[in-house]
Amino acid sequence: MSRLDSLLKIFDQYPDDTFTMYGLAMEYISTKDYNIAEQYLKMIINKDSTYVPAYMQYAQLKENLNQLDEAKSIYRAGIDAAKKINDIRSAKEMENFLNDIE
């Protein structure tokens, strides 16, 4: 069974598990299935607005697809989420990424 298949099986059993969703998003990014990856990243953010790595990956995905306005917006939301939970390191990292594309 592939890693993707394993994650899908876990997701079927635990559809609210954001960690599994994140794993699925990363798998789909690695196979260049960007639309599916985006769906999982959106699901994570909708379920847990403080899941900071999802913002980072989602913004980077948009940046890599040259959708810079969307990437900027997602970075800003991620910075706010990181600050909300006092994750200063992640906030600073996303601020740096944002500055690079502005």
Predicted features by range, described:
Residues 9-10, 43-44, 78:
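Canonical positions in the second alpha-helix
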